Design a protein with these regions (language model features):
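Predominantly a Rossmann-like dinucleotide-binding segment in NAD(P)-dependent oxidoreductases
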Residues: 1-55, 60-62, 193
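Conserved loop-to-helix N-cap of the C-terminal "lid" that shapes the substrate pocket in Rossmann-like
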Residues: 13-16, 170-176
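A general structural signal for well-ordered alpha-helical segments in protein cores
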Residues: 19-20, 156-157, 183
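C-terminal glycine/acidic-rich active-site capping loop/insertion
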Residues: 43-53, 61, 65-66, 89-174, ...
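Glycine-rich phosphate/pyrophosphate-binding beta-alpha loops
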Residues: 75-83
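C-terminal hydrophobic helical "lid"/dimerization subdomain
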Residues: 177-188
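C-terminal capping/lid region of NAD(P)-dependent oxidoreductase domains
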Residues: 188-198
Length: 198
């Protein structure tokens, strides 16, 4: 199902909506314009399903302008599995830069390379200069509960808590809908080469 845009909404929806949601959460602002450049360069080129070639993109860039004046960018590469870190999330502002380096699931890390990477946080203040790097180890019990470096555990716990106690979920229906809307706008921009206003 996830080899075709018609079934998945496209890579920028299916794989990237979570990152668009994180952008909104971190910035506490709504997107107003999205621009993307993306394509299919490596993955699934020789596959056929029912005679049809997969058309999902495996790489791209997305720029999101927010109502607050903040700007965010997503870089996607679906064929860089050899990297030490699967995700690199950065925020830059007038006080400096903070980077979170997140490895992929440890079960995919080749044994011959030694222990799987540990998540890292790098805080680089503007003044005084001097990056501070620290490992952020994740409890192995949380890693066993699901992927995403333990966050699956917290997602399930918060969701179960909302059901059992009748509270609001941590992520609303509107949050999910906006993340998908951002992904669809990015897909449209990538297809047309034009910015999409939300």
């Amino acid at each position: 199902w996830n080899r075709f845009n018609a079934r998945s909404g496209g890579t920028l929806v299916e794989k990237c909506c979570h990152f668009f949601d994180l952008m909104r959460l971190a910035l506490q602002s709504e997107p107003v314009r999205i621009m993307a450049s993306a394509g299919q360069s490596v993955n699934h080129l020789d596959e056929r399903y029912g005679g049809a070639a997969p058309d999902i993109w495996d790489n791209g860039y997305v720029i999101v302008d927010f109502a607050s004046g903040a700007r965010a960018m997503l870089e996607l590469c679906m064929f860089a599995e050899g990297s030490r870190y699967q995700e690199e999330v950065c925020a830059t502002g007038p006080s400096g830069k903070i980077e979170a380096l997140v490895p992929g699931p440890g079960r995919f890390w080749p044994e011959h390379l030694g222990a799987a990477p540990v998540p890292r946080l790098i805080v680089s203040p503007r003044d005084p200069k001097g990056p501070v790097e620290m490992d952020i180890p994740v409890d192995p019990t949380l890693l066993e509960a699901g992927d995403h470096n333990g966050s699956t555990f917290y997602q399930h716990r918060l969701f179960a808590q909302a059901i059992r106690q009748g509270g609001a979920p941590a992520v609303s229906l509107n949050d999910g809908a906006m993340a998908v809307r951002m992904g669809l706008a990015a897909q449209q921009s990538g297809l047309t080469g034009q910015a999409v206003t939300l």
